[in-house]
């Protein structure tokens, strides 16, 4: 939802006046806009409108005015502005990562959002730790959100496995775990709001035909039905088939966007669908499920997420979520993305691994041949080694390919740095054989537990 012109001008006026006063009444509109966006980062998506509003303010409020006039005007429109500006100056933050755009000490809230298809693996460690380390740097909140709104792809033990993995990654500091299947009524509420406002519609078109129409940038007939008809269709989605409701696959709810958008993925994308597959945490009557794009958008704003840190493969998702939130008039978080990391030579598919475990190829999720976090924990790897790996890569937009050998060389080096001063020296000889050595006198040998810490005693 784009802010009204007068509302926008009122919001940015104190910042433009302050900027003009700082430069003796002279204003560079683009520089002034930069000052505005620095303090109001939520307006970045409307930068063109902000620049136009700055130009209007310069013409109506600043041109021809003395610095004293500008100071008087600033006191008139925002008496406490200077004090608020000083109070809002961000405390310098130090940590293993570069400062995060738009983040404030004590106000940052980030999340990770795995699906319960299996435990976490190496691929999850980077993103999870990046988010967690930023939360620690800024004294903010870190949320684990389990996204389980696809009943067809749920491995029931994964709920506990994931929580256990994240507790290990965060040294037990995760206290807020949200499960999306427990929030369905919230998603339904906002789904109905979009129907009632005419911003979405229930589409019963054949999926193949609809894809052809989308490719041609043509709207289907469902789009133009009256709101009352859309409401009837929405209600019918919740009715069991035996009572006259839709069958699975009959309809989907779509957001009304630009059907001619240059990016086909942005054209009237789906928000809800019917899935009658049994869900381990929902009642048997539950059949309407939000697609990830809908539930994620709603949760990110309602849970107070300030920054969504994700891979570049989620760029379109961020744009879609922004459209949903703007139509609902809800706060939009800041989206930042890291480059794709291709872990070359890693078998990370949880579905394939699950089958292999069931067939006895692996002993379990902590089989030492796997790349799960449970395996790494069992092998003695320290969380700090993976934190150092995440910090070394950082929130970089560049794509990377990391080979099996390259990854382990880096992680093993980091792990050794951590373990080296902690590990006592022991030795072990399997199936020892006693031998006699001639020509040597007998004497006792005593070796320290650790050569650098003799106070630990001897072996």
Segments (PLM) and residue ranges:
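N-terminal Rossmann-like or analogous alpha/beta NTP/dinucleotide-binding catalytic cores
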Residues: 2-222, 313-347, 354-361
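Extended, domain-scale alpha-helical bundle/helix-rich regions
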Residues: 20-36, 40-47, 366-457
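Hydrophobic residues in alpha-helical segments
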Residues: 103, 195, 241-242, 357, ...
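Glycine- and acidic
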Residues: 110-117, 143-149, 301-309, 367-373, ...
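Preference for short coil/turn "hinge" residues that link or interrupt alpha-helices
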Residues: 113-115, 193, 265, 355-358, ...
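Active-site cores that bind ATP or allylic diphosphates and position pyrophosphate for catalysis
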Residues: 197-353, 361-364, 372, 411-420, ...
């Amino acid at each position: 939802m784009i802010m009204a012109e007068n509302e926008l001008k009122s919001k940015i006026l104190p910042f433009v006046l302050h900027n003009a006063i700082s430069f003796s009444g002279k204003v560079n509109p683009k520089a002034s806009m930069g000052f505005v966006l620095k303090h109001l980062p939520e307006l970045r998506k409307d930068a063109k409108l902000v620049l136009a509003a700055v130009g209007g303010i310069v013409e109506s409020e600043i041109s021809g005015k003395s610095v004293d006039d500008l100071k008087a005007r600033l006191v008139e429109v925002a008496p406490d502005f200077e004090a608020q500006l000083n109070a809002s100056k961000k405390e310098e933050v130090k940590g293993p990562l570069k400062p995060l755009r738009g983040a404030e000490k004590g106000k940052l809230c980030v999340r990770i959002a795995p699906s319960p298809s299996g435990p976490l693996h190496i691929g999850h460690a980077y993103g999870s730790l990046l988010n967690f380390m930023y939360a620690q740097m800024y004294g903010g909140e870190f949320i684990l959100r389990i996204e389980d709104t696809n009943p067809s792809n749920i491995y029931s033990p994964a709920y506990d496995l994931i929580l256990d993995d994240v507790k290990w990654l965060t040294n037990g500091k995760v206290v807020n775990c949200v499960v999306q299947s427990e929030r369905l009524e919230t998603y339904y509420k906002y789904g109905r709001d979009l129907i009632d406002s005419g911003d979405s519609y229930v589409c019963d078109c054949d999926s193949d035909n609809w894809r052809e129409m989308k490719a041609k940038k043509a709207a289907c007939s469902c789009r133009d039905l009256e709101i009352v008809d859309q409401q009837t269709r929405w209600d019918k989605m919740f009715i069991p088939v035996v009572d006259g409701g839709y069958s699975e696959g009959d309809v989907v709810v779509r957001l009304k966007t630009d059907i001619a958008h240059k990016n086909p993925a942005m054209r009237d994308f789906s928000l809800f669908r019917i899935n009658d597959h049994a869900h381990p945490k929902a009642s048997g009557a539950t059949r309407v499920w939000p697609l990830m794009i809908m539930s994620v958008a709603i949760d990110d704003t309602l849970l107070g997420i300030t920054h969504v840190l994700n891979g570049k493969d989620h760029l379109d998702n961020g744009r879609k979520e922004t459209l949903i939130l703007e139509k609902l008039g809800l706060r939009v978080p800041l989206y930042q993305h890291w480059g794709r990391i291709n872990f070359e030579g890693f078998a990370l598919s949880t579905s394939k691994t699950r089958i292999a475990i069931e067939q006895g190829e692996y002993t379990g999720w902590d089989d030492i041949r796997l790349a799960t976090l449970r395996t790494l924990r069992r092998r003695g790897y320290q969380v700090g080694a993976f934190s150092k790996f995440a910090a070394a890569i950082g929130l970089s937009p560049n794509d990377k390919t990391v080979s099996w050998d390259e990854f382990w060389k880096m992680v093993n080096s980091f792990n050794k740095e951590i373990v080296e001063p902690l590990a006592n020296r022991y030795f072990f000889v399997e199936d020892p054989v006693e031998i006699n050595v001639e020509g040597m006198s007998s004497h006792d040998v005593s070796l320290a537990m650790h050569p650098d810490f003799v106070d630990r005693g001897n072996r």
